[in-house]
């Protein structure tokens, strides 16, 4: 990638979040954790158990949420990885959710892309929902050894079919994040990221969460 392209791309990701400032928002502070373990089945295949915990304030209607994903990854080549997962989401107060996920991710120099498809079943909702989540990001090494890196990305939530009749479709969310990651060794990676999650609402203020995201990943 030419050096001049990188600042422009990073500026574009930042502007994606800034353009939402004109909308009325309901903001709150949250804490997100994202530990995971992965095991290599072969040179090109691996399984991963990923979890996430989102701690929020119940007083403003934001329940704590707990996730677990069972992933199967297959490296198609050095650029593309195809993945599938089953996800279980538990919300304090109900409306738990099960998702089937298909995902294609890629690496192009500094550029990272990901497209995720989700089939969603939400407790007490009338039908299966379908959502597309495209993500564009940048990963830049910040030391000579390459074990420290800066990363940023922006992800859209495109709801093709809501989980209930009359539910909101179209662009329903935007997630942006930036932070640093450190490869402690060949097996252990740590990351600390600022994450901003904005859920768009047609007839109400957009709901925005601001969270430090702490990631821990271990590979066997």
Residue ranges and their predicted role:
Residues 74, 109-110, 116-202, 218-220:
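Outer-membrane beta-barrel transmembrane domain signature
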Residues 19-21:
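N-terminal signal peptide c-region/cleavage motif recognized by signal peptidases
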Residues 23-26, 56-61, 89-95, 122-127, ...:
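Outer-membrane beta-barrel domain signature
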Residues 1-10:
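Bacterial N-terminal signal peptides that target proteins for export
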Residues 49, 53-65:
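Surface-exposed strand-loop-strand hairpins of Gram-negative outer-membrane beta-barrel proteins
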Residues 32-38, 46-52, 69-73, 81-87, ...:
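Transmembrane beta-strands of outer-membrane beta-barrel proteins
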Residues 29-31, 64-66, 96-100, 126-132, ...:
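Residues that define the transmembrane beta-barrel architecture of outer-membrane proteins
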Residues 27, 43-47, 78-80, 109-115, ...:
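Outer-envelope beta-barrel architecture signal
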């Amino acid at each position: 990638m030419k050096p001049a392209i990188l600042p422009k791309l990073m500026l574009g990701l930042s502007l994606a979040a800034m353009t939402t400032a004109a909308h009325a928002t309901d903001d709150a502070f949250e804490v997100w954790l994202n530990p995971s373990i992965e095991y290599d089945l072969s040179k090109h295949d691996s399984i991963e158990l990923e979890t996430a915990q989102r701690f929020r304030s119940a007083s403003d209607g934001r329940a704590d949420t707990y996730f677990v994903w069972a992933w199967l990854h297959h490296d198609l080549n050095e650029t593309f990885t195809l993945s599938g997962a089953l996800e279980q989401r538990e919300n304090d107060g109900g409306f738990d959710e099960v998702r089937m996920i298909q995902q294609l991710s890629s690496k192009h120099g500094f550029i990272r892309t990901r497209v995720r498809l989700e089939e969603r079943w939400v407790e007490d909702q009338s039908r299966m929902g379908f959502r597309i989540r495209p993500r564009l990001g940048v990963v830049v090494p910040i030391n000579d050894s390459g074990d420290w890196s800066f990363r940023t990305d922006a992800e859209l939530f495109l709801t093709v079919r809501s989980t209930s009749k009359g539910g909101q479709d179209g662009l329903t969310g935007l997630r942006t994040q930036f932070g640093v990651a450190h490869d402690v060794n060949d097996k252990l990676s740590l990351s600390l990221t600022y994450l901003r999650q904005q859920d768009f609402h047609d007839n109400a203020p957009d709901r925005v969460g601001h969270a430090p995201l702490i990631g821990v990943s271990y590979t066997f």
